């Protein structure tokens, strides 16, 4: 483990959690920050104000193991250093998470599942809830909705001896920077985006006739406007359904980003019709969304559900069009931080003048349930 004094990097903590090493993650942030997002498996103590008021006795109120490591975490890595130092005075091997939750935002893990003739690797950005996919068959691969640095996907592709044939985005994302353009350039693979968008770089447009084939696996686009006008879902071998931000396992996409009230209403109508299209598919089809609203455990289990199960667990999907639209617009969550800047960067495809961690900071707020 690479240490800098009292600190441990997000990379090292990710490795510890992935390898199931004995480590306790202690969250000392204000409660409202904890409720927005957290590190999976972490424990919480409401210590932020007292630690900053030079009252470390608050740490005596929790039971921590006397062996193994404890990693303290706050928003940016300052208060957690106070906590780690105090715990060391108590004989505990404690470290502060370098960069705090901002630094953790790029942490990731994976879940693999083998289907008949193809595999799905769900690459989960656990620090933010973004889900991307490596679909593979006969050593060829498609990468969809890349949200992490290129080296993450390069590592996984090399590890499984795959050749990238296509790189795809389901829509123009508003809560994270798309790494798909950079990824396509790295692998010398064609970049495909839905045709109805305003990006300012060269790409291959996805049309109703576009079909992606790798080995014995066939991926077909289904236009599903609503979350954005260009949003597209993808049906793979009639078994899996990649829904982007149109449909989640516990909710539906929001229609209001970059939209005034009239545009949000029109997009809500489009979203309803798109969902009806998806709900007409067989109930056993597996839904694979582009986001989740919860911190992703290091459990190697796909975040997925059958379409039939999603229909039963998301009450909004049973509403009439009018009731659906009214309910949707009443439940819109707070907008993602910096989403206008993120959309602008994704349209330009150039992130050279920004710090991605700073721009992407904040909770995932894509779903309405």
Residue ranges and their predicted role:
Residues 2-70, 148, 359:
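Positively charged, proline/Ser/Thr-rich regional signature most characteristic
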Residues 237-287, 291:
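A contiguous binding-surface segment within folded domains or other stable secondary-structure elements
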Residues 85, 129, 141, 149-222:
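Active-site HxH/HxHxD metal-binding segment of metal-dependent hydrolases
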Residues 45, 56-102:
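Catalytic cysteine-centered active loop of the rhodanese-like fold, especially the PTP/DSP P-loop
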Residues 30, 112-160, 234-243, 250:
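Conserved beta-strand hairpin/beta-sheet module of binuclear metal-dependent hydrolase folds
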Residues 74, 143-146, 163-173, 192-196, ...:
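Active-site neighborhood of phospho(di)ester-bond hydrolases with catalytic His/Asp-centered motifs
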Residues 31-32, 76-79, 150-151, 172-178, ...:
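Active-site environment of divalent metal-dependent phosphoester hydrolases
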Residues 1-7, 85-90, 110-111, 273-286, ...:
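Accessory terminal helices/loops
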């Amino acid at each position: 483990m690479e240490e800098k004094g009292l600190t441990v990097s997000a990379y090292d903590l990710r490795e510890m959690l992935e390898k199931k090493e004995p480590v306790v993650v202690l969250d000392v942030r204000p409660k409202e920050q904890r409720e927005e997002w957290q590190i999976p498996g972490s424990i919480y103590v409401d210590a932020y104000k007292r630690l900053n008021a030079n009252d470390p006795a608050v740490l005596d109120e929790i039971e921590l193991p006397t062996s193994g490591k404890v990693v303290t975490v706050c928003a940016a890595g300052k208060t957690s250093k106070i906590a780690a130092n105090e715990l060391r005075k108590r004989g505990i091997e404690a470290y502060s998470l370098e960069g705090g939750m901002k630094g953790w935002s790029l942490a990731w893990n994976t879940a693999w599942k083998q289907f008949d003739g193809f595999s799905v690797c769900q690459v989960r950005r656990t620090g933010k809830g973004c889900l991307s996919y490596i679909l593979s068959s006969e050593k060829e691969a498609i990468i969809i909705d890349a949200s992490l640095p290129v080296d993450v996907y390069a590592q996984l592709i090399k590890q499984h001896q795959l050749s990238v044939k296509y790189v795809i985005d389901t829509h123009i994302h508003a809560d994270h920077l798309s790494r798909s353009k950079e990824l396509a350039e790295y692998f010398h693979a064609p970049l495909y985006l839905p045709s109805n968008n305003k990006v300012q770089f060269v790409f291959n447009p996805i049309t109703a006739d576009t079909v992606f084939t790798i080995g014995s696996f066939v991926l077909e686009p289904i236009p599903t406007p609503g979350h954005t006008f260009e949003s597209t879902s993808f049906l793979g071998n009639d078994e899996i359904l990649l829904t982007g931000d149109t449909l989640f396992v516990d909710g539906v996409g929001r229609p209001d980003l970059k939209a005034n009230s009239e545009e949000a209403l029109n997009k809500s109508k489009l979203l309803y019709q798109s969902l009806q299209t998806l709900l007409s598919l067989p109930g056993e089809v597996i839904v694979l969304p582009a986001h989740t609203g919860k911190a992703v455990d290091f459990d190697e289990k796909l975040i997925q559900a059958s379409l039939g199960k999603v229909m039963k667990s998301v009450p909004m999907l049973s509403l009439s069009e009018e009731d659906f639209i009214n309910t949707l617009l009443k439940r819109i969550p707070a907008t993602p931080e910096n989403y206008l800047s993120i959309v602008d960067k994704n349209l330009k495809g150039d992130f050279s003048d920004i710090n991605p961690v700073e721009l992407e900071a904040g909770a995932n707020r894509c779903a309405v349930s």
